[in-house]
Design a protein with these regions (language model features):
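N-terminal leader/signal peptides at the extreme start of proteins
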Residues: 1-11
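N-terminal single-pass transmembrane signal-anchor helix
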Residues: 10-32
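Aliphatic-rich helix starts adjacent to a transmembrane/signal segment
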Residues: 33-58
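Beta-strand/loop motifs with alternating small/hydrophobic and polar/acidic residues, enriched
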Residues: 50, 57-75
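GGW-centered surface loops in extracellular recognition modules
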Residues: 73-123, 248
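Short aromatic-cysteine micro-motif
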Residues: 106-107, 135-336
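Acidic glycine-/aspartate-rich tracts in secreted/extracellular proteins
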Residues: 116-120, 199-203, 346-352, 363-365, ...
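Disulfide-stabilized, aromatic/cysteine-rich ligand-recognition loop
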Residues: 229-232, 236, 242, 247, ...
Length: 394
């Protein structure tokens, strides 16, 4: 009996669809006008998407207006926001489990990276630290390294001081470096996470050579990557970002690894995508992506010239993109940690002249060569079109 009812309903639905199509044809509407590339159905879908985008834009503007009025720290869904920030409250961005997004009054966006404060994570530090002595901070660091060991892969890179005798703005000595690191670790332990820029550090005007870099980096979509800066320049620039009473900083190595753990544990992203081959989640040479974002731009000559907006790769190509060009490059609402440009961190690489560290992949290589967890080294004098950075707040 149930089978017959379902079958009858199915026939009725099919008959209704056929009837509508026949009536449209009788009214002079052809099948191609209905289903073609510029057909009624496709246009209706596009109109729906544009309406949704328009709705999101309005919510973003409202959040930015709210942020301008937030002169004190606020709490939202159990997370403390810096002064001058507000949650976007947009579907898909309004949950810690999805990657909670906040904005300042000018459209700079950050994502909350949750770091669980549990006995499983802090096996040696425990959950009762209040004084945060150097020894206790060392235990916190050791526990977080163990928690993220799958992304370290036995590396010798460490969040340790190494001198930079060439550039101005680096840490003066080991104590100054350790003080900054312990401040970060203390904040993560107390607040159960930290904020990270949703986008690679960006800049409004395209930068095509090394040298002085004074423009404050932004965290917005569809702007040029802030490249051609050295590691120490990136540190200085990150510290200039307005963050209220929070600290804005270039990321330490452990923070990068904690983001990957967050993506895996909350976003159910398979570690093979993060550690072995990130092709499908980043702008790599062998990712044959199709960009439909009309506000994005692309470059085929390492950022010397950009063109907009949409582009489809049919073959392996080296194409540099503006920030946040496509949602397929986003995990937990954090864009471009795999591919596009490499990103400087505060981590020490080697003891010799190649002491600086950058993470992730870039547009000139395949996804299995430089996956998201990748660590590489370079010199204190190095800067390039393919190296940028990202800001964190804690």
């Amino acid at each position: 009996m149930n089978f017959k009812v379902i079958n009858k309903s199915g026939i009725t639905l099919i008959a209704l669809v056929v009837t509508i199509i026949v009536l449209l044809i009788l009214a002079g509407v052809s099948i191609s006008m209905l289903t073609g590339q510029n057909g009624i159905l496709n246009r209706a879908t596009e109109a729906k998407e544009k309406t949704e985008t328009s709705g999101e834009d309005e919510k973003r503007k409202l959040a930015q207006a709210e942020a301008l009025m937030n002169t004190e720290r606020t709490t939202y869904k159990g997370v403390t926001l810096p002064e001058g920030f507000a949650p976007t409250k947009i579907d898909g961005e309004d949950s810690i489990d999805d990657g909670l997004v906040i904005t300042d009054g000018y459209g700079n966006e950050y994502v909350w990276v949750e770091v669980p404060k549990t006995a499983e994570v802090y096996k040696t530090a425990g959950l009762e630290i209040t004084d945060f002595s150097d020894e206790e901070c060392g235990k916190i660091e050791s526990d977080l390294k163990e928690y993220t060991k799958v992304y370290r892969s036995g590396t010798i890179f460490e969040d340790e001081y190494v001198a930079d005798n060439v550039n101005q703005g680096w840490f003066n000595d080991k104590k100054e470096y350790d003080d900054a690191k312990y401040k970060m670790l203390k904040s993560i332990y107390k607040n159960k996470g930290f904020w990270v820029a949703r986008y690679e550090a960006g800049i409004e005007k395209n930068r095509i050579s090394s040298g002085r870099a004074e423009e404050i980096p932004i965290s917005k979509p569809n702007v040029y990557t802030y490249n051609y800066v050295g590691r120490t320049q990136a540190k200085v620039l990150a510290e200039k970002v307005e963050s209220g009473s929070y600290t804005s900083s270039l990321m330490f190595g452990v923070q990068w690894d904690l983001i990957l753990a967050f993506m895996h544990n909350k976003g159910n992203i398979d570690n093979s995508l993060l550690v072995e081959d990130s092709k499908n989640i980043g702008n790599y040479a062998n990712n044959l992506w199709s960009i439909t974002n009309e506000k994005s731009k692309y470059s085929k000559d390492n950022g010397m010239n950009y063109y907009g907006a949409v582009y489809k790769k049919d073959n392996s190509e080296n194409i540099l993109l503006t920030t946040g060009a496509d949602k397929s490059f986003s995990e937990m609402n954090i864009f471009d940690m795999a591919g596009n440009v490499l990103e400087w961190t505060l981590e020490k690489a080697y003891e010799d002249s190649s002491t600086c560290s950058y993470r992730g992949g870039m547009f000139e290589v395949d996804g299995n060569f430089n996956p998201m967890a990748n660590r590489s080294s370079d010199y204190v004098t190095s800067s390039s079109y393919c190296i940028g950075f990202r800001v964190s707040m804690y």
